[in-house]
Amino acid sequence: MAAGTTTKERLERLINAKKQLEAQINRNGQILAANDNVGMSGPLVDAEGFPRNDIDVYQVRLARQTIICLQNDHKELMNQIQTLLNQYHSEIATTDPELVNRASALDLDSDRSPGGANITDLAPARAIVVVNLVSPDSPAERAGLCAGDAILRFGSINSGNFKGDLAQIGELVRNMQSQNVQLKVKRGEQQLDLILVPKTWSGRGLLGCNIVLPPEAMDH
C-alpha cells in the first residue's frame, strides 16, 4: 500500500470505479431495452430464420458483447472490493456509516454473477417481489413494468441476498434516485431485462407502483 493511502481511500476508489463500470453496462443495457427489450438472450432472427427487422441486430450484438466484457471486469472488481471491505472492517472498531451504507448495496457474493445494474443470462432462482399495481405515466410504467410482473432481480438485490423486507428495496430506490436500476422480470413464461429510473413524478413515491412479497415468501 502506498504511504498515506488508507484502506478506506482505496475502497472508495474501487467503489467509484464500480459505479463507472455499471454506468457503461447501463448505457449498453439501454441499447438492448430500446431494441424491443431483447435483453441478453432474446432471439435475433424471426420465425423464418431471417434477421429481425424490428431491431438493430448489429447494435444488439455489439451491446451484448460489450456487456459480457464489462461483467468480467465487474466480477474482478467486486472480488477486490470484498477483500478490501473485509480488511477495512478488521482495521477499525467503529465503521464509517456512510461508507458501509454504500458498500452494503453491493452484491459481494463472489459465487454469484456481479451485482449492481447488470444484465445476465443467469436468472435468479425465484421472485423476490411481485408488482400488483402500476400507476399511469409513472417511472414504473415508463420502464415497462406491468401489474403481475414477478421481479427476480432489483438492481443489486436478488433471491440470494434479499432478506424478505421491502424496506431493503426502499433503501436501494432512495439511494438510486435519478439513476438507472436494472430489473430482471418474469412475465408469464418470458424473462425481460428492464431499466427503471426512480424519480419524483406527479404521483406518490419514486416509482409509481406497488410491490408485495410473493405468496410463497409470505407462507414462510
Curated annotation (Swiss-Prot):
> Which residue numbers delimit the PDZ domain?
102-200
Q: Does the keyword Transferase apply?
A: no
Q: Which GO annotations describe the biological process of this protein?
A: proteasome regulatory particle assembly
- Could you tell me which SUPFAM superfamilies the record lists for this protein? PDZ domain-like
The record's Gene3D superfamilies line, in alphabetical order, gives: 2.30.42.10, 6.10.140.1710
Q: Which UniProt keywords apply?
A: Chaperone, Coiled coil
A Gene Ontology CC term for this entry? nucleus
Which parts of the chain are coiled coil? 4-32, 61-91
Instruction: Identify the InterPro entries for this entry.
Output: Nas2_N, PDZ, PDZ_6, PDZ_sf, PSMD9
**Subunit:** Interacts with PI31; this interaction is increased by PI31 ADP-ribosylation. Interacts with Rpt5.
Say what the protein does: Acts as a chaperone during the assembly of the 26S proteasome, specifically of the base subcomplex of the PA700/19S regulatory complex (RC).
For this chain, the family text in UniProt reads:
Belongs to the proteasome subunit p27 family.
Q: What is this protein called?
A: 26S proteasome non-ATPase regulatory subunit 9
Species of origin reads Drosophila melanogaster (Fruit fly)
